[in-house]
Amino acid sequence: MVLAELGGRITRAIQQMNNVTIIDEKVLNDFLNEITRALLQSDVSFGLVEKMQTNIKKIVNLDDLAAGHNKRLIIEQAIFKELCRMLDPGKPAFAPKKAKPSVVMFVGLQGAGKTTTCTKYAYYHQKKGYKAALVCADTFRAGAFDQLKQNATKAKIPFYGSYTESDPVKIAVEGVDRFKKEKCDLIIVDTSGRHKQAASLFEEMRQVAEATEPDLVIFVMDSSIGQAAFEQAEAFKETVSVGAVIITKMDGHAKGGGALSAVAATKSPVIFIGTGEHMDEFEVFDVKPFVSRLLGKGDWSGLVDKLQEVVPKDLQNELVENLSQGNFTLRSMYDQFQCSLRIPLNQLFSMLPGISAEMMPKGHGEESRVKMKRYMTMMDSMTNKELDSPNPKIFNESRIMRIARGSGRLVREVMEMLEEYKRIAKTMKGIKIPKNGDMSKVIPPQMLKQMGGMSGLQSLMKQMGSAKDMMGMFGGGGK
Protein backbone atom coordinates (compact mmCIF):
# COMPACT_ATOMS: atom_id res chain seq x y z
CA MET A 1 0.00 0.00 0.00
CA VAL A 2 1.04 3.59 -0.49
CA LEU A 3 2.52 5.13 2.68
CA ALA A 4 2.74 1.64 4.19
CA GLU A 5 4.88 2.74 7.12
CA LEU A 6 2.59 5.65 8.00
CA GLY A 7 -0.52 3.46 7.72
CA GLY A 8 1.09 0.80 9.92
CA ARG A 9 1.99 3.31 12.63
CA ILE A 10 -1.48 4.87 12.67
CA THR A 11 -3.12 1.43 12.80
CA ARG A 12 -0.90 0.37 15.71
CA ALA A 13 -1.64 3.61 17.58
CA ILE A 14 -5.38 2.95 17.23
CA GLN A 15 -4.96 -0.65 18.39
CA GLN A 16 -2.97 0.47 21.44
CA MET A 17 -5.67 3.00 22.34
CA ASN A 18 -8.35 0.33 21.97
CA ASN A 19 -6.47 -1.92 24.42
CA VAL A 20 -6.66 0.71 27.17
CA THR A 21 -9.47 0.25 29.69
CA ILE A 22 -10.20 3.93 30.36
CA ILE A 23 -9.75 6.76 27.84
CA ASP A 24 -8.51 9.81 29.74
CA GLU A 25 -6.59 12.96 28.79
CA LYS A 26 -3.21 11.20 29.01
CA VAL A 27 -4.31 8.36 26.70
CA LEU A 28 -5.70 10.87 24.19
CA ASN A 29 -2.51 12.97 24.27
CA ASP A 30 -0.28 9.90 23.88
CA PHE A 31 -2.39 8.77 20.93
CA LEU A 32 -2.31 12.19 19.24
CA ASN A 33 1.44 12.53 19.85
CA GLU A 34 2.07 9.18 18.13
CA ILE A 35 -0.13 10.18 15.17
CA THR A 36 1.68 13.53 15.00
CA ARG A 37 5.12 11.90 14.98
CA ALA A 38 4.03 9.46 12.27
CA LEU A 39 2.72 12.25 10.03
CA LEU A 40 5.75 14.50 10.52
CA GLN A 41 8.16 11.63 9.80
CA SER A 42 6.22 11.00 6.58
CA ASP A 43 6.97 14.60 5.53
CA VAL A 44 3.53 16.06 6.16
CA SER A 45 4.08 19.76 6.84
CA PHE A 46 4.22 20.87 10.47
CA GLY A 47 1.54 23.54 10.00
CA LEU A 48 -1.01 21.04 8.69
CA VAL A 49 -0.25 18.51 11.44
CA GLU A 50 -0.51 21.15 14.17
CA LYS A 51 -3.84 22.36 12.78
CA MET A 52 -5.16 18.79 12.62
CA GLN A 53 -4.17 18.10 16.24
CA THR A 54 -5.87 21.31 17.43
CA ASN A 55 -9.08 20.48 15.54
CA ILE A 56 -9.20 16.95 16.97
CA LYS A 57 -8.84 18.26 20.52
CA LYS A 58 -11.75 20.64 19.88
CA ILE A 59 -13.91 17.78 18.61
CA VAL A 60 -12.87 15.33 21.34
CA ASN A 61 -13.38 17.26 24.56
CA LEU A 62 -13.32 14.47 27.13
CA ASP A 63 -14.72 16.70 29.89
CA ASP A 64 -17.85 17.45 27.86
CA LEU A 65 -18.53 13.85 26.79
CA ALA A 66 -21.21 12.04 28.77
CA ALA A 67 -20.39 8.69 30.33
CA GLY A 68 -22.38 6.76 27.74
CA HIS A 69 -20.44 8.06 24.74
CA ASN A 70 -18.05 5.75 22.90
CA LYS A 71 -14.88 7.82 23.25
CA ARG A 72 -12.77 5.49 21.09
CA LEU A 73 -15.23 5.77 18.21
CA ILE A 74 -15.42 9.56 18.54
CA ILE A 75 -11.60 9.83 18.47
CA GLU A 76 -11.34 7.56 15.41
CA GLN A 77 -14.07 9.52 13.62
CA ALA A 78 -12.27 12.78 14.40
CA ILE A 79 -8.98 11.42 13.01
CA PHE A 80 -10.79 10.24 9.87
CA LYS A 81 -12.52 13.60 9.39
CA GLU A 82 -9.35 15.66 9.84
CA LEU A 83 -7.20 13.47 7.56
CA CYS A 84 -9.90 13.75 4.88
CA ARG A 85 -9.98 17.51 5.35
CA MET A 86 -6.18 17.67 4.99
CA LEU A 87 -6.16 15.73 1.70
CA ASP A 88 -9.30 17.14 0.07
CA PRO A 89 -9.08 20.57 -1.62
CA GLY A 90 -12.86 20.67 -1.81
CA LYS A 91 -13.25 20.83 -5.59
CA PRO A 92 -13.43 18.09 -8.24
CA ALA A 93 -11.06 17.95 -11.21
CA PHE A 94 -12.21 18.23 -14.82
CA ALA A 95 -13.47 14.88 -16.11
CA PRO A 96 -13.27 14.13 -19.87
CA LYS A 97 -16.47 13.21 -21.67
CA LYS A 98 -16.87 10.61 -24.39
CA ALA A 99 -17.63 11.72 -27.97
CA LYS A 100 -16.33 15.20 -27.17
CA PRO A 101 -12.62 15.99 -27.71
CA SER A 102 -10.81 16.85 -24.48
CA VAL A 103 -7.18 17.98 -24.40
CA VAL A 104 -5.18 17.12 -21.28
CA MET A 105 -1.68 18.55 -20.88
CA PHE A 106 0.88 16.91 -18.57
CA VAL A 107 3.55 18.99 -16.81
CA GLY A 108 6.09 18.17 -14.13
CA LEU A 109 9.68 18.10 -12.96
CA GLN A 110 12.30 16.02 -14.74
CA GLY A 111 12.42 12.45 -13.46
CA ALA A 112 8.93 12.44 -11.96
CA GLY A 113 7.75 9.69 -14.33
CA LYS A 114 5.61 12.00 -16.45
CA THR A 115 5.86 10.16 -19.78
CA THR A 116 5.02 6.79 -18.21
CA THR A 117 2.15 8.42 -16.32
CA CYS A 118 0.76 9.88 -19.56
CA THR A 119 0.52 6.37 -20.97
CA LYS A 120 -1.04 4.98 -17.78
CA TYR A 121 -3.63 7.77 -17.83
CA ALA A 122 -4.44 7.05 -21.49
CA TYR A 123 -4.56 3.29 -20.87
CA TYR A 124 -6.89 3.71 -17.88
CA HIS A 125 -9.35 5.77 -19.93
CA GLN A 126 -9.02 3.51 -22.95
CA LYS A 127 -10.22 0.61 -20.78
CA LYS A 128 -13.21 2.78 -19.81
CA GLY A 129 -14.20 3.15 -23.46
CA TYR A 130 -12.48 6.41 -24.38
CA LYS A 131 -10.66 6.82 -27.68
CA ALA A 132 -7.36 8.10 -26.27
CA ALA A 133 -4.26 9.38 -28.07
CA LEU A 134 -0.80 10.61 -27.04
CA VAL A 135 1.20 13.59 -28.35
CA CYS A 136 4.91 13.92 -27.51
CA ALA A 137 5.77 17.63 -27.24
CA ASP A 138 8.94 16.91 -25.27
CA THR A 139 11.79 17.98 -27.56
CA PHE A 140 14.19 18.74 -24.71
CA ARG A 141 14.95 15.26 -23.33
CA ALA A 142 16.83 12.85 -25.58
CA GLY A 143 14.82 9.67 -26.11
CA ALA A 144 11.53 11.17 -24.92
CA PHE A 145 9.67 10.37 -28.15
CA ASP A 146 11.17 6.87 -28.26
CA GLN A 147 9.93 6.21 -24.73
CA LEU A 148 6.42 7.48 -25.44
CA LYS A 149 6.31 5.56 -28.73
CA GLN A 150 7.36 2.33 -27.00
CA ASN A 151 4.84 2.77 -24.17
CA ALA A 152 2.00 3.71 -26.52
CA THR A 153 2.70 0.80 -28.88
CA LYS A 154 2.68 -1.65 -25.98
CA ALA A 155 -0.64 -0.26 -24.72
CA LYS A 156 -2.07 -0.04 -28.28
CA ILE A 157 -2.67 3.70 -28.04
CA PRO A 158 -2.23 5.97 -31.13
CA PHE A 159 0.56 8.52 -30.79
CA TYR A 160 2.13 11.49 -32.55
CA GLY A 161 5.61 13.01 -32.39
CA SER A 162 8.59 13.99 -34.51
CA TYR A 163 12.29 13.12 -34.71
CA THR A 164 13.08 16.21 -36.80
CA GLU A 165 10.86 19.06 -35.59
CA SER A 166 12.36 20.93 -32.62
CA ASP A 167 9.46 23.29 -31.89
CA PRO A 168 7.29 21.68 -29.17
CA VAL A 169 4.44 24.13 -29.79
CA LYS A 170 4.20 23.14 -33.45
CA ILE A 171 4.28 19.41 -32.61
CA ALA A 172 1.61 19.84 -29.94
CA VAL A 173 -0.72 21.78 -32.24
CA GLU A 174 -0.25 19.34 -35.15
CA GLY A 175 -0.84 16.34 -32.89
CA VAL A 176 -3.96 17.78 -31.28
CA ASP A 177 -5.42 18.81 -34.67
CA ARG A 178 -4.71 15.39 -36.15
CA PHE A 179 -6.39 13.46 -33.35
CA LYS A 180 -9.38 15.80 -33.27
CA LYS A 181 -9.91 14.99 -36.97
CA GLU A 182 -9.67 11.29 -36.07
CA LYS A 183 -12.50 11.79 -33.55
CA CYS A 184 -10.40 11.00 -30.48
CA ASP A 185 -12.18 12.10 -27.32
CA LEU A 186 -9.09 12.23 -25.06
CA ILE A 187 -5.89 13.81 -26.42
CA ILE A 188 -2.95 13.79 -23.99
CA VAL A 189 -0.01 16.14 -24.54
CA ASP A 190 3.29 15.23 -22.87
CA THR A 191 5.61 18.22 -22.33
CA SER A 192 9.27 18.61 -21.40
CA GLY A 193 10.17 18.04 -17.76
CA ARG A 194 11.38 21.17 -16.05
CA HIS A 195 13.44 22.48 -13.18
CA LYS A 196 11.92 25.26 -11.10
CA GLN A 197 14.89 27.44 -12.02
CA ALA A 198 14.61 26.86 -15.79
CA ALA A 199 12.69 29.98 -16.84
CA SER A 200 12.94 29.16 -20.56
CA LEU A 201 11.30 25.77 -20.09
CA PHE A 202 8.49 27.34 -18.08
CA GLU A 203 7.93 29.84 -20.90
CA GLU A 204 7.81 26.95 -23.37
CA MET A 205 5.23 25.21 -21.18
CA ARG A 206 3.11 28.38 -21.12
CA GLN A 207 3.29 28.64 -24.93
CA VAL A 208 2.20 25.02 -25.42
CA ALA A 209 -0.74 25.58 -23.08
CA GLU A 210 -1.70 28.79 -24.88
CA ALA A 211 -1.56 27.10 -28.31
CA THR A 212 -3.41 23.87 -27.43
CA GLU A 213 -5.93 25.36 -24.96
CA PRO A 214 -6.08 22.24 -22.76
CA ASP A 215 -9.24 21.43 -20.84
CA LEU A 216 -7.08 20.18 -17.98
CA VAL A 217 -3.44 20.62 -16.95
CA ILE A 218 -2.14 17.77 -14.79
CA PHE A 219 0.92 18.27 -12.60
CA VAL A 220 2.88 15.01 -12.14
CA MET A 221 4.75 14.90 -8.83
CA ASP A 222 7.31 12.41 -7.49
CA SER A 223 6.23 11.22 -4.01
CA SER A 224 9.79 11.47 -2.69
CA ILE A 225 9.86 15.25 -3.10
CA GLY A 226 8.72 15.66 0.51
CA GLN A 227 7.98 19.07 1.98
CA ALA A 228 9.39 20.84 -1.10
CA ALA A 229 6.18 19.79 -2.86
CA PHE A 230 4.28 22.96 -1.97
CA GLU A 231 6.95 25.26 -3.41
CA GLN A 232 7.25 23.23 -6.62
CA ALA A 233 3.49 23.02 -7.14
CA GLU A 234 3.19 26.78 -6.62
CA ALA A 235 5.86 27.42 -9.30
CA PHE A 236 3.86 25.43 -11.84
CA LYS A 237 0.52 26.98 -10.87
CA GLU A 238 1.97 30.45 -11.40
CA THR A 239 2.79 29.52 -15.02
CA VAL A 240 -0.15 27.37 -16.13
CA SER A 241 -3.53 26.68 -14.62
CA VAL A 242 -2.86 23.35 -12.89
CA GLY A 243 -6.22 21.66 -12.37
CA ALA A 244 -5.21 18.27 -10.98
CA VAL A 245 -2.27 16.29 -9.66
CA ILE A 246 -0.98 12.75 -10.11
CA ILE A 247 1.56 11.49 -7.57
CA THR A 248 4.02 8.84 -8.78
CA LYS A 249 6.30 6.23 -7.18
CA MET A 250 4.05 5.74 -4.17
CA ASP A 251 5.10 2.09 -3.97
CA GLY A 252 8.71 2.69 -3.04
CA HIS A 253 8.78 5.72 -0.78
CA ALA A 254 7.50 5.67 2.80
CA LYS A 255 7.49 9.48 3.00
CA GLY A 256 4.76 10.38 0.53
CA GLY A 257 2.88 12.53 3.03
CA GLY A 258 4.58 15.73 1.94
CA ALA A 259 3.43 15.31 -1.65
CA LEU A 260 -0.13 14.48 -0.61
CA SER A 261 -0.62 17.21 1.95
CA ALA A 262 1.29 19.99 0.21
CA VAL A 263 -0.46 19.42 -3.10
CA ALA A 264 -3.83 19.41 -1.36
CA ALA A 265 -2.84 22.72 0.23
CA THR A 266 -2.46 24.26 -3.26
CA LYS A 267 -6.15 23.44 -3.86
CA SER A 268 -5.38 21.10 -6.76
CA PRO A 269 -7.02 17.70 -6.23
CA VAL A 270 -4.98 14.51 -6.47
CA ILE A 271 -6.77 12.33 -9.03
CA PHE A 272 -4.46 9.31 -9.43
CA ILE A 273 -1.46 7.76 -7.73
CA GLY A 274 1.17 5.58 -9.41
CA THR A 275 1.94 2.49 -7.33
CA GLY A 276 4.44 0.66 -9.53
CA GLU A 277 6.05 0.35 -12.94
CA HIS A 278 3.37 -1.80 -14.58
CA MET A 279 0.61 -0.23 -16.65
CA ASP A 280 -2.14 -1.34 -14.24
CA GLU A 281 -0.34 -0.08 -11.13
CA PHE A 282 -2.27 3.15 -11.30
CA GLU A 283 -5.02 3.91 -8.79
CA VAL A 284 -7.81 6.45 -8.74
CA PHE A 285 -7.26 8.64 -5.70
CA ASP A 286 -10.43 8.91 -3.66
CA VAL A 287 -9.89 10.65 -0.32
CA LYS A 288 -12.29 8.73 1.93
CA PRO A 289 -11.32 5.19 0.83
CA PHE A 290 -7.65 6.22 0.93
CA VAL A 291 -7.91 7.47 4.53
CA SER A 292 -9.95 4.39 5.45
CA ARG A 293 -7.10 2.20 4.20
CA LEU A 294 -4.56 4.40 5.98
CA LEU A 295 -6.44 3.83 9.25
CA GLY A 296 -6.54 0.06 8.69
CA LYS A 297 -10.28 0.02 7.98
CA GLY A 298 -9.93 -1.37 4.47
CA ASP A 299 -11.86 -0.55 1.31
CA TRP A 300 -14.27 -3.36 0.43
CA SER A 301 -15.96 -1.48 -2.43
CA GLY A 302 -12.56 -0.75 -3.96
CA LEU A 303 -11.54 -4.39 -3.60
CA VAL A 304 -14.70 -5.68 -5.29
CA ASP A 305 -14.36 -3.09 -8.08
CA LYS A 306 -10.72 -4.06 -8.64
CA LEU A 307 -11.51 -7.76 -8.79
CA GLN A 308 -14.44 -7.27 -11.15
CA GLU A 309 -12.35 -4.93 -13.31
CA VAL A 310 -9.76 -7.60 -14.12
CA VAL A 311 -12.18 -10.52 -14.57
CA PRO A 312 -14.06 -10.72 -17.89
CA LYS A 313 -17.84 -10.71 -17.39
CA ASP A 314 -18.36 -14.07 -19.11
CA LEU A 315 -15.69 -15.63 -16.89
CA GLN A 316 -17.33 -14.10 -13.81
CA ASN A 317 -20.63 -15.75 -14.72
CA GLU A 318 -18.99 -19.08 -15.52
CA LEU A 319 -17.04 -19.25 -12.28
CA VAL A 320 -19.97 -18.08 -10.18
CA GLU A 321 -22.02 -20.90 -11.68
CA ASN A 322 -19.29 -23.49 -11.07
CA LEU A 323 -18.56 -22.35 -7.52
CA SER A 324 -22.25 -22.15 -6.62
CA GLN A 325 -22.42 -25.85 -7.56
CA GLY A 326 -19.29 -26.67 -5.56
CA ASN A 327 -17.11 -27.20 -8.65
CA PHE A 328 -13.58 -25.83 -8.41
CA THR A 329 -11.35 -27.43 -11.02
CA LEU A 330 -7.77 -26.90 -12.10
CA ARG A 331 -9.13 -24.85 -14.99
CA SER A 332 -10.87 -22.65 -12.42
CA MET A 333 -7.56 -22.22 -10.62
CA TYR A 334 -5.80 -21.43 -13.92
CA ASP A 335 -8.35 -18.71 -14.72
CA GLN A 336 -8.02 -17.47 -11.17
CA PHE A 337 -4.25 -17.15 -11.47
CA GLN A 338 -4.56 -15.30 -14.79
CA CYS A 339 -6.75 -12.67 -13.16
CA SER A 340 -4.69 -12.57 -9.97
CA LEU A 341 -1.57 -11.70 -11.96
CA ARG A 342 -3.30 -8.50 -13.07
CA ILE A 343 -3.71 -7.21 -9.50
CA PRO A 344 -0.59 -6.08 -7.60
CA LEU A 345 -0.54 -7.78 -4.21
CA ASN A 346 0.16 -4.54 -2.35
CA GLN A 347 -3.08 -3.08 -3.76
CA LEU A 348 -5.06 -6.17 -2.83
CA PHE A 349 -3.98 -6.38 0.80
CA SER A 350 -4.16 -2.62 1.42
CA MET A 351 -7.92 -2.90 0.82
CA LEU A 352 -8.44 -5.47 3.59
CA PRO A 353 -9.52 -4.18 7.02
CA GLY A 354 -6.85 -4.51 9.70
CA ILE A 355 -4.16 -5.37 7.17
CA SER A 356 -1.11 -3.18 6.67
CA ALA A 357 1.17 -3.45 3.65
CA GLU A 358 3.97 -3.76 6.21
CA MET A 359 2.71 -7.31 6.79
CA MET A 360 3.71 -8.24 3.24
CA PRO A 361 7.36 -9.39 3.25
CA LYS A 362 9.53 -7.53 0.75
CA GLY A 363 9.70 -9.33 -2.57
CA HIS A 364 6.84 -11.64 -1.60
CA GLY A 365 4.57 -10.34 -4.35
CA GLU A 366 7.08 -11.08 -7.12
CA GLU A 367 7.82 -14.50 -5.63
CA SER A 368 4.11 -15.32 -5.75
CA ARG A 369 3.79 -14.16 -9.36
CA VAL A 370 6.69 -16.39 -10.39
CA LYS A 371 5.14 -19.39 -8.64
CA MET A 372 1.74 -18.81 -10.23
CA LYS A 373 3.31 -18.63 -13.69
CA ARG A 374 5.23 -21.85 -13.00
CA TYR A 375 2.02 -23.63 -11.99
CA MET A 376 0.25 -22.32 -15.10
CA THR A 377 3.04 -23.76 -17.26
CA MET A 378 2.39 -27.18 -15.71
CA MET A 379 -1.36 -26.85 -16.29
CA ASP A 380 -0.66 -26.00 -19.94
CA SER A 381 0.63 -29.57 -20.27
CA MET A 382 -2.63 -31.10 -19.01
CA THR A 383 -5.48 -32.49 -21.07
CA ASN A 384 -8.97 -30.97 -21.03
CA LYS A 385 -10.17 -33.94 -19.00
CA GLU A 386 -7.51 -33.29 -16.36
CA LEU A 387 -8.21 -29.57 -16.22
CA ASP A 388 -11.98 -30.03 -15.92
CA SER A 389 -12.06 -32.93 -13.46
CA PRO A 390 -13.02 -31.99 -9.89
CA ASN A 391 -11.32 -35.19 -8.69
CA PRO A 392 -7.54 -34.87 -8.11
CA LYS A 393 -7.32 -38.64 -7.66
CA ILE A 394 -7.17 -39.07 -11.44
CA PHE A 395 -3.54 -37.90 -11.31
CA ASN A 396 -1.70 -41.19 -11.12
CA GLU A 397 2.06 -41.60 -11.42
CA SER A 398 2.12 -41.81 -15.22
CA ARG A 399 0.00 -38.65 -15.63
CA ILE A 400 2.22 -36.71 -13.22
CA MET A 401 5.38 -37.83 -15.05
CA ARG A 402 3.87 -36.84 -18.42
CA ILE A 403 2.95 -33.36 -17.12
CA ALA A 404 6.44 -32.92 -15.65
CA ARG A 405 8.09 -33.83 -18.96
CA GLY A 406 5.74 -31.64 -20.99
CA SER A 407 6.29 -28.58 -18.80
CA GLY A 408 10.01 -29.10 -18.19
CA ARG A 409 9.48 -29.28 -14.43
CA LEU A 410 10.33 -31.85 -11.76
CA VAL A 411 7.83 -34.50 -10.65
CA ARG A 412 7.89 -33.11 -7.09
CA GLU A 413 6.98 -29.66 -8.44
CA VAL A 414 3.90 -31.08 -10.19
CA MET A 415 2.93 -32.85 -6.96
CA GLU A 416 3.42 -29.58 -5.04
CA MET A 417 1.13 -27.79 -7.51
CA LEU A 418 -1.57 -30.46 -7.07
CA GLU A 419 -1.37 -30.12 -3.29
CA GLU A 420 -1.73 -26.36 -3.70
CA TYR A 421 -4.82 -26.95 -5.83
CA LYS A 422 -6.35 -29.17 -3.13
CA ARG A 423 -5.82 -26.50 -0.48
CA ILE A 424 -7.30 -23.69 -2.56
CA ALA A 425 -10.19 -25.89 -3.75
CA LYS A 426 -11.04 -26.73 -0.15
CA THR A 427 -11.14 -23.04 0.76
CA MET A 428 -13.15 -22.05 -2.31
CA LYS A 429 -15.72 -24.79 -1.78
CA GLY A 430 -16.30 -23.46 1.73
CA ILE A 431 -17.27 -20.04 0.41
CA LYS A 432 -20.96 -19.70 -0.39
CA ILE A 433 -21.33 -18.05 -3.79
CA PRO A 434 -24.77 -16.52 -4.49
CA LYS A 435 -26.24 -17.72 -7.76
CA ASN A 436 -27.23 -14.18 -8.70
CA GLY A 437 -23.51 -13.40 -9.04
CA ASP A 438 -23.51 -10.42 -6.67
CA MET A 439 -19.86 -10.66 -5.69
CA SER A 440 -20.03 -7.63 -3.40
CA LYS A 441 -21.92 -9.80 -0.92
CA VAL A 442 -19.35 -12.60 -1.01
CA ILE A 443 -16.12 -11.21 0.33
CA PRO A 444 -16.60 -9.38 3.57
CA PRO A 445 -18.29 -11.25 6.48
CA GLN A 446 -18.45 -14.78 5.16
CA MET A 447 -14.87 -15.12 4.01
CA LEU A 448 -13.47 -13.50 7.14
CA LYS A 449 -15.58 -15.77 9.32
CA GLN A 450 -14.29 -18.84 7.50
CA MET A 451 -10.73 -17.64 8.11
CA GLY A 452 -11.30 -17.22 11.83
CA GLY A 453 -12.08 -13.51 11.71
CA MET A 454 -9.63 -10.68 11.23
CA SER A 455 -7.15 -12.13 13.71
CA GLY A 456 -7.22 -15.38 11.76
CA LEU A 457 -6.58 -13.55 8.50
CA GLN A 458 -3.67 -11.62 10.00
CA SER A 459 -2.23 -14.82 11.45
CA LEU A 460 -2.59 -16.57 8.09
CA MET A 461 -0.73 -13.77 6.32
CA LYS A 462 2.15 -13.90 8.76
CA GLN A 463 2.49 -17.66 8.48
CA MET A 464 1.93 -18.07 4.74
CA GLY A 465 4.74 -19.64 2.80
CA SER A 466 3.24 -18.07 -0.32
CA ALA A 467 1.01 -15.04 -0.69
CA LYS A 468 -0.46 -16.79 -3.71
CA ASP A 469 -2.92 -18.70 -1.51
CA MET A 470 -4.62 -15.47 -0.58
CA MET A 471 -4.25 -14.05 -4.06
CA GLY A 472 -5.86 -17.13 -5.50
CA MET A 473 -8.77 -17.01 -3.10
CA PHE A 474 -9.49 -13.36 -3.77
CA GLY A 475 -9.01 -13.72 -7.52
CA GLY A 476 -11.65 -16.44 -7.45
CA GLY A 477 -13.80 -14.47 -5.07
CA GLY A 478 -13.97 -11.66 -7.57
CA LYS A 479 -15.16 -13.98 -10.28
From Swiss-Prot:
One of its GO terms (cellular component) is signal recognition particle, endoplasmic reticulum targeting. Gene3D superfamilies: P-loop containing nucleotide triphosphate hydrolases, Signal recognition particle SRP54, nucleotide-binding domain, Signal recognition particle, SRP54 subunit, M-domain. The keyword ATP-binding does not apply. Its main location: cytoplasm. Its EC number is 3.6.5.4. It catalyses: GTP + H2O = GDP + phosphate + H(+). GO terms for biological process: SRP-dependent cotranslational protein targeting to membrane. Pfam families: SRP54, SRP54_N, SRP_SPB. The keyword Hydrolase applies. It is found in: Cytoplasm; Endoplasmic reticulum. Residues 296-479 are annotated as: M-domain. It is an enzyme of class 3 (hydrolase). One of its GO terms (molecular function) is 7S RNA binding. Keywords: Cytoplasm, Endoplasmic reticulum, GTP-binding, Hydrolase, Nucleotide-binding, Ribonucleoprotein, RNA-binding, Signal recognition particle. Disulfide bonds: none annotated. GTP binds at residues 108-115, 190-194, 248-251. Coiled coil: none annotated. It comes from the Eukaryota. Residues 1-295 are annotated as: G-domain. PANTHER family: SIGNAL RECOGNITION PARTICLE 54K PROTEIN SRP54, SIGNAL RECOGNITION PARTICLE SUBUNIT SRP54. Component of the signal recognition particle (SRP) complex, a ribonucleoprotein complex that mediates the cotranslational targeting of secretory and membrane proteins to the endoplasmic reticulum (ER). As part of the SRP complex, associates with the SRP receptor (SR) component SRPRA to target secretory proteins to the endoplasmic reticulum membrane. Binds to the signal sequence of presecretory proteins when they emerge from the ribosomes. Displays basal GTPase activity, and stimulates reciprocal GTPase activation of the SR subunit SRPRA. The NG domain, also named G domain, is a special guanosine triphosphatase (GTPase) domain, which binds GTP and forms a guanosine 5'-triphosphate (GTP)-dependent complex with a homologous NG domain in the SRP receptor subunit SRPRA. The two NG domains undergo cooperative rearrangements upon their assembly, which culminate in the reciprocal activation of the GTPase activity of one another. SRP receptor compaction upon binding with cargo-loaded SRP and GTPase rearrangement drive SRP-mediated cotranslational protein translocation into the ER. The M domain binds the 7SL RNA in presence of SRP19 and binds the signal sequence of presecretory proteins. Belongs to the GTP-binding SRP family. SRP54 subfamily. Component of a signal recognition particle (SRP) complex that consists of a 7SL RNA molecule of 300 nucleotides and six protein subunits: SRP72, SRP68, SRP54, SRP19, SRP14 and SRP9. This is Signal recognition particle subunit SRP54 1. It comes from Arabidopsis thaliana.
